[in-house]
C-alpha cells in the first residue's frame, strides 16, 4: 500500500496531536487503525479474487486444450477404424466373389459354415450344482469358533443367567 517512514509517521502524529488534541487522539488513532485494517483486508480480498479469476482462466484454457486433444484423438481413431473397415469389406467382397465363381479358395469348415451346417454338437447346457448353502455358511473351523467365542447356540439373556446361576443352598 502506502509506505510511510518513521519520520513521516512522527510528523503526522505531531500535527494530529496539535489539531485534534490529547483527549480525542486515542479514539481517532483507534478509528484510523480500524480503517487501515479494513483497507488492508479489502486489498487482500481483491488480490485473492484476481488470483482466483486468473487460475479459473488458466483452468478453462487447459480444459479447452484437453477437449481439443480428445476430439483430435477421437477423429483419428474413427478415421482409422473407417479405413480398416473399408479394407476389411473390400477383402470380404473379393473373397465372396471368388467363392461365388466356383473357385475353391476356402476350407471345408468355411464351406459348411456358409451352407448353414453345424461343425459339431453344441455344448451341453449349464446346470447349477445345487450345493447346500448351509454347508457353505458353516465352513468356519471349530478351533476358530472356540478361540474367538463364536456362539454355536443362541440363548436369551434370561436363559443364560438361569444356566450359569449357582445352585441354591439347601
From Swiss-Prot:
- Gene Ontology BP term (one): protein transport by the Tat complex
Spell out the Polar residues composition-biased ranges: 73-93
Q: Which UniProt keywords apply?
A: Cell inner membrane, Cell membrane, Membrane, Protein transport, Translocation, Transmembrane, Transmembrane helix, Transport
Q: Which GO terms describe its cellular component?
A: TAT protein transport complex
Q: Which parts of this chain are annotated as the region Disordered?
A: 69-170
Location of this chain's protein in the cell: Cell inner membrane
Q: Which GO terms describe its molecular function?
A: protein transmembrane transporter activity
- Transmembrane stretches, start-end: 1-21
Composition skew (Basic residues), residue ranges: 128-137
- Membrane topology per record: Single-pass membrane protein
InterPro entries on file: TatA/B/E, TatB
- Gene3D superfamilies in UniProt: 1.20.5.3310
Family listed: Belongs to the TatB family.
Function comment: Part of the twin-arginine translocation (Tat) system that transports large folded proteins containing a characteristic twin-arginine motif in their signal peptide across membranes. Together with TatC, TatB is part of a receptor directly interacting with Tat signal peptides. TatB may form an oligomeric binding site that transiently accommodates folded Tat precursor proteins before their translocation.
Q: How does it assemble?
A: The Tat system comprises two distinct complexes: a TatABC complex, containing multiple copies of TatA, TatB and TatC subunits, and a separate TatA complex, containing only TatA subunits. Substrates initially bind to the TatABC complex, which probably triggers association of the separate TatA complex to form the active translocon.
Q: Which NCBIfam families does the entry mention? A: tatB
List the protein's name: Sec-independent protein translocase protein TatB
List the lineage, top down: Bacteria, Pseudomonadati, Pseudomonadota, Betaproteobacteria, Burkholderiales
What's the encoding gene here?
tatB
Amino acid at each position: 500500500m502506502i509506505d510511510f517512514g518513521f519520520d513521516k509517521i512522527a510528523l503526522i502524529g505531531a500535527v494530529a496531536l496539535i489539531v485534534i488534541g490529547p483527549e480525542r487522539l486515542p479514539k481517532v488513532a483507534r478509528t484510523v487503525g480500524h480503517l487501515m485494517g479494513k483497507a488492508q483486508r479489502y486489498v487482500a480480498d481483491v488480490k485473492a479474487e484476481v488470483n482466483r479469476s486468473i487460475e479459473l482462466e488458466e483452468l478453462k484454457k487447459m480444459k479447452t486444450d484437453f477437449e481439443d486433444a480428445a476430439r483430435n484423438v477421437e477423429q483419428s481413431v474413427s478415421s482409422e477404424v473407417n479405413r480398416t473397415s473399408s479394407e476389411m469389406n473390400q477383402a470380404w467382397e473379393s473373397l465372396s466373389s471368388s467363392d461365388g465363381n466356383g473357385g475353391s479358395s476356402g476350407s471345408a469348415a468355411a464351406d459348411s459354415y456358409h451352407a448353414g451346417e453345424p461343425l459339431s454338437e453344441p455344448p451341453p447346457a449349464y446346470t447349477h450344482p445345487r450345493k447346500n448353502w448351509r454347508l457353505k455358511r458353516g465352513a468356519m473351523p471349530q478351533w476358530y469358533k472356540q478361540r474367538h467365542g463364536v456362539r454355536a447356540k443362541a440363548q436369551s439373556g434370561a436363559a443364560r443367567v438361569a444356566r450359569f446361576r449357582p445352585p441354591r443352598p439347601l
